[in-house]
């Protein structure tokens, strides 16, 4: 490793070094990563040097910016790209370094009347999120975030720096748009931004006992919602606090008018933050933690939201989970994305999250099993969690195509995504 240390401008940590444990710790503090070394890349040349060194010496590299999707990574070189966080916007196109976060992109794009297909958190890395497809607030209107990718600057499994477009390498370009990080290390992404001249959004909140009414209104609103409107239903329970039910929404426009009227008719709301807001404030709607936390989560895709599903969701308290959320999908997501992400025909997504403690997995198991007749079995790659496999994110044809590409481009397994397309995570 001393050879690698002399090749890079960034930092290298080895086990026993001061700062090693901090450097190897991902955003999800419940995940342990007993890696062989950590490289903090100062730029694309450091990425190339690290991958080239690994290829030469039979080592494996796992790349993370923030580590939101991290899983246990044993014996690998952990390549940190968080310092590569530049964001540039010109002519409706954003260029984001491998470590750039969505909050940076939205802050730069919003004043121009533009947005990217960002998720609920401003501190998630653009690259990791987009490589996995990227399922966010505006996906009903604009599809997967990966569908907006125009070009990627990458380091391949030999350590060579390459620019990838639909014309230069159509197969790799296809894979990078939703197939994960198994095929190359992305050092920069270029993607088209989408119009958002005015954004309306916020959260409505009620005591937990109003959950049946709120869920009924959610079913009514989402049954006929235009693609500009996205609504999420939340059951919330935090330690030491009473249970709550909430609805989060965004609307690409100034006023959704009657579209949200069924929620207003419920009455008894104890909070309502709905307003026209800057694109840069998108993360304030859900107000998710922006500091590292230990947590466990799971996602299921729902084939519908009929009375049986509603009854299962409301049957029991959600403790010890923090949040049981149902997201409305549909719209542009049902149409082909042009990349490995494909399309999502399921109309709703169930997201469960809780503390990394005994009882959390069991509670998620109970709800997942109750909903088995109403789930498709597929999971979006961008929302896989520890213990799950990439195979569950793709249909058989897409998975076979990704595996063929992996074997052809990285036959020695130099690169390893959090959820590898070959084998298990």
PLM features per residue range, with description:
Residues 1-425:
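Soluble FAD-dependent oxygen oxidases
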